[in-house]
UniProtKB/Swiss-Prot annotation:
Propeptide: 1148-1181
Topology within the bilayer: Peptidoglycan-anchor
Compositional bias of kind Polar residues: 33-52, 1109-1123, 1137-1147
GO cellular component, one term: membrane
Annotated stretches, region: 5 X 17 AA tandem repeats: 1034-1118
Gene source species: Streptococcus pyogenes serotype M1
Name recorded for this polypeptide: C5a peptidase
Sorted UniProt keywords: Cell wall, Hydrolase, Peptidoglycan-anchor, Protease, Repeat, Secreted, Serine protease, Signal, Virulence
Lineage summary: Bacteria, Bacillati, Bacillota, Bacilli, Lactobacillales
Chain positions of motif LPXTG sorting signal: 1144-1148
Pentaglycyl murein peptidoglycan amidated threonine: residues bearing it: 1147
Listed PANTHER family: CEREVISIN-RELATED (PTHR43806:SF11), PEPTIDASE S8 (PTHR43806)
Biased composition (Basic and acidic residues): 1029-1054, 1061-1071, 1078-1088, 1095-1107
Acidic residues bias (residue ranges): 70-81
Subcellular location: Secreted, Cell wall
Length: 1181
């Protein structure tokens, strides 16, 4: 079906470029394959490339899902310097250097002590499985290659041959093995991520580095196995590829394997058997697999808080969900290596402050600065010429603040935070303008400081962070979809400086940065244990190392809430290599399975039993207590913060030498249950830490987290209630329009994929012009020329009169939605299909239809795997999923159309949590194929051009639309407009139509058609000329929507062009100035900024609408044609052969579903930009 596009091609190019940028980002690391280490915007495209952060200002409109306080703090990606061009890493021995390492200055995880005991990993092999690497970075270096496991390429080839490995290359003494397991034959586009991760694990920069401090990883003397894995043929194939990499890494002698990537919310149970076997194989050989927890925060992502009545908000996915892996969360320590600036305070003291720069200021130069409020108005910048503009964060985009300052003559910009304990944010690059971000505390000091000068220092220093010790907002919460405790432990992941491609270094943030540090510590600890416990098997040493590392971790405390961060966020706490190395004791659950306690469902009174192990030759006396806490609730939302309940008293225990002993702590929260159940009606977590000290007044020696759920976790609802059950027409991801109760998306059905994410039944709306053309013999719908398009809508919803971009829910007297279909094959409300917002992962989803006696008349195929709709950010997932297998076209098991009547459409599914029972959701669906009976005659007054019908239509279902349609030629496209009846039931027919360019086209009586549609989608249409002649249309020849077996014998009515409606005009498609036809993409793409728009243009928006949903001043009168050119333009621009049913993720192919998701979403994004209806306001800081 060819439609007309009227927009300029520069706008098309913008849309194409926007689509290309996001699809390229997807192809670099694919859907959720690498945990995003620079989630620069709310879309959080998973790429570690340095990108600017833009933040939205809090909306003035109260919503159900408010912005979190620090919704975009996660990204810092700062090119540390401009280093020499890429050069191959040295393969000769390199003498040790005296230049200080980054760890010499700041070592929050206390790795240096363990490094000394384990020889910095010399003689050890470590593996990194990731999306791409710079194989020849200068940091890939051994200080003494004589201690290496593989002395030569020949040694490696011998090991490969022993295990049947026929692929993989020797790069140099450091990178002993490299292979691309993706098998796509492409060079890795993303070399940043894997290079950065590998540097944290095993980097060893030379003394010649231009960095002020030398990079040294946790195991700098270990050799590297670099294994590239990327999604090519779906998630299942991807999982099999990294499973093979795991097996090869084990066989080539890796002590530890780092996997800093993940698929959010996916369950371990759904991994291929080959992948599960690979995990088991590594464990049996004593090889530690360390994974990142993910950067997806919680259900709702980084911009929404979870609902308090849906406590299963964890999003840790695979491979992190595997129990044998050590899964790592991210936190920010209280001190950080950072750029600094110095000011003189009022008392003439030098004050140093941390800064994060974009386009750095000249070092050691004194700059004058002036306060410029929030940088919005011209008057804000009256004093900034030749100075640095000091601007407070908020209200408008960072880019605009910087651009405004530059326009006013400022030489640079300092933006200070509007939050007291926020994370630093990298500012966008605006015309190479020097800019830096500072804390609120430092910004207020500068604002009030009488001496308005500042100097930027050349050498970075370690300074306290504004946030203090704090879990990263982006770090993914547990539990896993399977209901298991994850993450296991936490490590620094905020602003980590490491190697990136081309011999450069940069700061990145993410759990991908946390994991390799823990991987290095695990490798060093296992190497220490080889000497300390020589009689243990490798698997026993691995088990001990994991338990000791978790036990010796320090539970992190939230100073603001006066409670410990949740174990579902931090695991056992912050890793401490020094404590682990010196530990002679550790603590496990009562079965000695792991160093975490999963209590599952509990009541108000329960017990926590743990086992204390003493591996020393002396008895140990300890004191212990338990903390008891739950989730903090803010209104109807989880605050993602802890709420302390109470602490038990300290108790004393003595553990004999080389022995173990159990302790049991009773917990009673009865006094809190009433207050807790009020906001958390479906249950809540009861959790905390059992902490041990050698003296109650001293620091914590070790601890173990425990988690229980007050309620029935396994049987929590998996599916959000249907939108039909919402009193205000809104849901978690969807906000109803404010101008009408029960009203849905106000921007048109074409954007349901982006906006209307809720649980409902979808169906299809087919305009009568297309139905008419098909019945008149057009076999291929693509050959139909029409200004109207087929659209996916929601069953039970109907367009407002004269405004088919606004839909509302029509209800029976009992409040149930009027969901009706007419399965007659005309494509108009012929079927229903299930769309759901899943709050939890589920399995075995099936739809079935029951008659009024409860007999099953139809059953769908089974969808085996359902993933919770944990976000709605375009980059990873949408807020709902459409299930193709659930489409019911009104037929029974034998393929026959069912009788007219009311049926129950039931969707059944089972949460994947242990002990869960099957759940279901029902919808009432009316089936009715009765064709409306319409008047057979009419009269027409030439004086007032009023058409009066002889009778009102008779329908089995309520009348949905009774209209007069008229079709005219707008250039080469048949264009249809509609006239609604006057209050007295007559229709006023126009004499002429107006084209898009404003020209007039005379209308003949033969251009008008009387069209009636009922609420089940049955349509009857009659030419007005026949009504005036008083002829009655017979069913086999008229315009009823019962599809005839053969073409009408009468010739089709001709339109204004003289062409029959089933024939295409002979004119060629209109071309614009580029020589391209309007339905073809331009070959060139304009340069864009980070928003996907050309830098000097903002997206066009439709005029603001009033409460009726109409453009003010443009509302057509009843009985008059709709003349809103805005609407007509958008309809044409959005005309496409693809129905919007293809814009939501489906579960037709579970292995490729998520891979296809972003491509489908980008199609929608492309359409939206072309139409200029997608009203995205620019991201604000």
């Amino acid at each position: 079906m060819r439609k007309k596009q009227k927009l300029p091609f520069d706008k098309l190019a913008i849309a194409l470029m926007s689509t290309s940028i996001l699809l390229n980002a997807q192809s670099d690391i694919k859907a959720n394959t690498v945990t995003e280490d620079t989630p620069a915007t709310e879309q959080a495209v998973e790429t570690p490339q340095p990108t600017a952060v833009s933040e939205e200002a809090p909306s003035s409109k109260e919503t159900k899902t408010p912005q979190t306080p620090d919704d975009a703090e996660e990204t810092i990606a700062d090119d540390a310097n401009d280093l020499a061009p890429q050069a191959p890493a040295k393969t000769a021995d390199t003498p040790a250097t005296s230049k200080a390492t980054i760890r010499d200055l700041n070592d929050p995880s206390q790795v240096k002590t363990l490094q000394e005991k384990a020889g910095k990993g010399a003689g050890t092999v470590v593996a990194v499985i990731d999306a791409g690497f710079d194989k020849n970075h200068e940091a890939w270096r051994l200080t003494d290659k004589t201690k290496a496991r593989y002395q030569s390429k020949e040694d490696l080839e011998k090991a490969k041959k022993e295990h049947g490995i026929t692929y993989g290359e020797w790069v140099n003494d450091k990178v002993a093995y490299y292979h691309d397991y993706s098998k796509d034959g492409k060079t890795a586009v993303d070399q940043e991520h894997g290079t950065h991760v590998s540097g944290i694990l095993s980097g060893n920069a030379p003394s010649e580095t231009k960095e002020p401090y030398r990079l040294e990883g946790a195991m700098p003397e270990a050799q590297l196995l670099l294994m590239r894995v990327e999604i090519v043929n779906g998630l299942a194939d991807y999982a099999r590829n990294y499973a093979q990499a795991i097996i090869d890494a084990v066989n080539l002698g890796a002590k530890v394997i780092n996997m800093s990537f993940g698929n959010a919310a996916l369950a371990y149970a759904n991994l291929p058997d080959e992948t599960k076997k690979a995990f088991d194989y590594a464990k049996s050989k004593g090889v530690s697999i360390v994974t990142s927890a993910g950067n997806d925060s919680s259900f709702g992502g980084k911009t929404r808080l979870p609902l308090a009545d849906h406590p299963d908000y964890g999003v840790v996915g695979t491979p992190a969900a595997a129990d044998s892996t050590l899964t790592v969360a991210s936190y920010s320590p209280d001190k950080q290596l950072t750029e600094t600036a110095t000011v003189k305070t009022a008392d003439q003291q030098d004050k140093e402050m941390p800064v994060l720069s974009t386009n750095r200021f000249e070092p050691n130069k004194a700059y004058d600065y002036a306060y410029a409020n929030r940088g919005m108005k011209e008057d804000d910048f009256k004093d900034v010429k030749g100075k640095i503009a000091l601007i407070e964060r908020g209200d408008i985009d960072f880019k605009d603040k910087i651009a405004n300052a530059k326009k006013a003559g400022a030489v640079g910009v300092l933006i200070y935070d509007n939050q007291d304990k926020g994370f630093p944010i990298e500012l966008p690059n605006v015309d190479q303008m020097p800019a830096a971000f500072i804390s609120r505390k430092d910004g207020l000091l500068l604002k009030e400081n009488p001496q308005k000068t500042i100097t930027f220092n050349a050498t970075p220093k370690v300074l306290p962070t504004a946030s203090g010790t704090k879990l990263s907002r982006f770090s993914s919460w547990g539990l896993t979809a399977d209901g298991n405790i994850k993450p296991d432990i936490a490590a620094p992941g905020q602003d980590i400086l490491s190697s990136v491609a081309n011999n450069k270094y940069a700061k990145l943030s993410g759990t991908s940065m946390s994991a390799p540090l823990v991987a290095g510590i695990m490798g060093l600890l296992q190497k220490q244990y080889e000497t300390q416990y020589p009689d243990m098997t490798p698997s026993e040493r691995l088990d001990l190392a994991k338990k000791v590392l978790m036990s010796s971790a320090t539970a992190l405390y939230d100073e603001d809430e006066k409670a410990y961060f949740s174990p579902r966020q931090q695991g056992a706490g912050a890793v401490d290599a020094k404590k682990a190395s010196a530990a002679t004791m550790y603590v496990t659950d009562k079965d000695n399975t792991s160093s975490k306690v999963h209590l599952n469902n509990v009541s108000d009174k329960f017990e926590v039993t743990v086992t204390v192990h003493n591996k020393s030759d002396k008895p140990q006396e300890l004191y212990y207590q338990a903390t008891v806490q739950t989730d903090k609730v803010d209104g109807k939302l989880f605050a993602l913060a802890p709420k302390a309940l109470y602490e038990t008293s300290w108790q004393k225990i003595t553990i004999p030498a080389n022995s173990s002993k159990q302790v049991t702590i009773p917990i009673d929260v009865s006094q809190f249950s009433k207050d807790l159940l009020a906001p958390m009606k479906n249950g809540y977590f009861l959790e905390g830490f059992v902490r041990f000290k050698q003296d109650p007044t001293k620091e914590e020696l070790m601890s173990i987290p425990y988690i229980g759920f007050r309620g029935d976790f396994g049987n929590l609802s998996a599916l959000e209630k249907p939108i039909y059950d919402s009193k205000d027409g809104s849901s978690y991801y969807h906000e109803a329009n404010s101008d009408a109760k029960d009203q849905l998306d106000g921007d048109g059905l074409q954007f349901y994929a982006l906006k209307n994410n809720f649980t409902a039944l979808t169906t299809e709306s087919n305009p009568w012009t297309i139905i008419k053309a098909v019945k008149e013999g057009v076999e291929n719908i693509e050959d139909i020329e029409s200004s109207e398009i087929t659209e996916t809508i929601f069953a039970g919803t109907f367009a407002k009169q004269d405004d088919d971009s606004h839909y509302y829910i029509h209800r029976h007297a009992n409040g149930k939605p009027y969901a009706a279909i007419s399965p007659n094959g005309d494509g108009n409300r012929d079927y229903v299909q299930f769309q759901g917002t899943f709050l939890r992962n589920a399995k075995n989803l099936v739809a079935e239809v029951l008659d009024k006696e409860g007999n099953v008349v139809w059953t769908s195929e089974v969808t085996e795997q359902v993933v919770k709709n944990y976000n709605n950010d375009l980059a990873s997932t949408l807020g709902s999923t459409r299930f193709e297998k659930t489409r019911w076209d009104g037929k029974d098991k034998d393929g026959k159309v069912v009788a007219n009547g009311t049926y129950t459409y039931r969707v059944r599914y089972t949460p994947i949590s242990s002990g869960a029972k099957e759940q279901h959701t029902d919808f009432d669906v009316i089936v009715d194929n009765t064709t409306p009976e319409v008047a057979t005659s009419a009269t027409f007054s030439t004086e007032d051009r009023r058409l009066t019908l002889a009778s009102k239509p008779k329908t089995s279902q309520p009348v949905y639309r009774e209209r007069i349609a008229y079709t005219y030629m707008d250039e080469d496209l048949p264009t249809t407009e509609y006239i609604s009846p006057n209050e007295d039931g007559t229709f006023t027919l126009p004499e002429e139509a107006e084209t898009m360019e404003g020209a007039t086209v005379p209308l003949k009586m033969s251009d008008f058609t009387y069209v009636v549609e009922d609420m089940a989608g049955n349509i009857t249409y009659t030419p007005v000329t026949k009504l005036l002649e008083g002829h009655s249309n017979k069913p086999e020849q008229d315009g009823s929507d019962q599809a005839p077996d053969k073409k009408p014998e009468t010739k089709p009515e001709q339109d204004g062009s003289g062409q029959a409606p089933d024939k295409k005009p002979e004119t060629k498609p209109e071309q614009d100035g580029s020589g391209q036809t309007p339905d073809k993409k331009p070959e060139t793409k304009p340069e864009q900024d980070g928003s996907g728009q050309t830098p000097d243009k903002k997206p066009e928006t439709k005029p603001e609408k009033d409460s009726s949903g109409q453009t003010p001043g443009k509302t057509p009168q009843k009985g008059q044609p709709s003349r809103t050119l805005e609407k007509r333009s958008s309809k044409r621009a959005l005309a496409t052969k693809a129905s919007t049913k293809d814009q939501l993720p489906t579960t037709n192919d579970k292995d490729t579903n998520r891979l296809h998701l972003l491509k489908l979403v980008m199609t929608t994004f492309f359409l939206g930009l072309v139409a200029h209806i997608f009203k995205t306001k620019r991201t604000e800081d």
